[in-house]
């Protein structure tokens, strides 16, 4: 039990990273009477609009991060992004602060190398063949060993930034430059993956609570340039594929430990299920659960990290999501077409409230429910096509 926000008996959640996923986490926490603090590197981030208060700091600056957390003294520290000084989280955890799911999990998943080595080399789980490279010369060697096409990604990036397909050896320099441009924290290390021919990509939302591990129905998704553009639930897959996916997801999340929801990304191939990545937090493709499940991924995350039981997840209806992305740049913009999109049956729109636009930035999603996935996908994409981000040259 705990008291109201701002009281001596309040429970406090501090969010590191305040994007659209964090916004929904804050909303769910407030429904349970939790005091909320949103933190990000820029002002007016989406979650800051709904949190009780907010702070703007460089989250890669360990001293600034530690000073803020010691000042706020939260009951739980909830990372929403990878670009955080994770060694500081390790130190704070040693001081007695609770990091979700654990400081070790945050450190391992902050970049693609840590989690890939854990999954493939320590746990022996099936993955695409891969190499790491610290220079253009090493990248060319990796491309030679893996063959083309292959996929080049920065060790640390989000939403597909810096990711490219190397289709011939001569593309290596362009891929290297794209990776450097898209990397977070000025990283210069990349992972090179053998190209995987897959039937589909899925996210298996895996919930670790005080009562054990449960799985949400699988979510299918399509990515473009490494970033998701639509997702749907449930994804149709065989019982054997689902069992294999759940085995992989449980192995990875058990090793990471802690409480909360994990977005485990997997490839379904004719050779079996391959592990791709894991995020120890709600997943962008999982926003569809706001339309499909009795408890969304955000509600599940908050319940589990606060120590409440999570006994089951029920799929209420098939559903789908589709994204709205910006084309231009600027702070003076408007999203149009909301009335048209909301006129479609069983359809919702979530406008994230980001303070500025840039090409490819995700600004909103549509959510549609229907009697089957195919109809839900059609409606969600139709609704998204009705929305536009209009950028103005001058403040309107």
Feature annotation, model-predicted:
Residues 208-212, 224, 268-271, 370-372:
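Short acidic-glycine loop/turn motifs at beta-strand connectors
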Residues 1-110, 114, 137, 387, ...:
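ATP-binding N-terminal substructure of ATP-dependent carboxylate-amine bond-forming enzymes
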Residues 303-396:
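Peripheral (often C-terminal) accessory segments that flank ATP-dependent C-N-forming ligase machineries
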Residues 4, 216, 222-224, 270, ...:
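ATP-dependent carboxylate/acyl-activation modules
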